[in-house]
A protein has these predicted regions:
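Catalytic cores of secreted/periplasmic lytic hydrolases that degrade extracellular macromolecules
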Residues: 16-176
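Sec-dependent N-terminal signal peptides
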Residues: 4-14
Length: 176
């Protein structure tokens, strides 16, 4: 019995470590793009990253892998992808690249009537206000969405990216 408990514990810790590595590699891969989008649109980099991580399971969901859709955005007509050699029809939007998906999320936040008030009311430092505002404006049906996104931000300290300068060379020029 002790051996079984030990094996289960080892497997569980391996899975947690694997998920952590997936999250960290996703952040590393897309943080600079999220920072650029923040400086162009005012949507916090932490919100862009955490929402993408949450909605796409760090890029591992079917729609993230097959459609480059990191945010679960619907629209764009009928799209298709293949799963187990079968054609699957979907209402989710297809993007040419992950970056196009990130950019579209920021465009949705800044141009759609239900969300654009957030850029007027909040700074890119107020990630808590953004998460709650996005949820209250109808982005998702889950009443836990903001809390889940905020948990990701806190767990990985994504709010530190909201402090990043527009020009990455400024980081080296202004050491702290």
């Amino acid at each position: 019995m002790k051996k079984i408990i030990l094996i289960v514990s080892i497997l569980a810790s391996t899975l947690v470590a694997s998920a952590q590595n997936t999250s960290l590699s996703y952040i590393e891969k897309f943080k600079d793009n999220a920072i650029r989008i923040m400086h162009e649109t005012g949507v916090p980099a932490s919100i862009v990253l955490a929402a993408a991580m949450h909605e796409s399971a760090c890029g591992n969901s079917n729609i993230a892998q097959k459609l480059n859709n990191q945010f679960g955005v619907k629209g764009g007509g009928k799209n298709f992808y293949y799963k187990n050699n079968k054609k699957v029809s979907t209402q989710y939007k297809k993007y040419d690249s992950v970056m196009d998906s990130f950019q579209d999320f920021a465009d949705i936040m800044t141009s759609r009537k239900q969300f654009c008030h957030l850029t007027d009311e909040l700074t890119h430092y107020d990630y808590v206000g953004w998460a709650k505002g996005i949820q209250h404006s109808g982005y998702c049906s889950s009443h836990k969405w903001a809390a889940q996104v905020l948990n990701i931000i806190h767990k990985y300290q994504l709010n530190l990216y909201d402090e990043s300068p527009a020009d990455p060379t400024q980081l080296a020029a202004n050491p702290q």
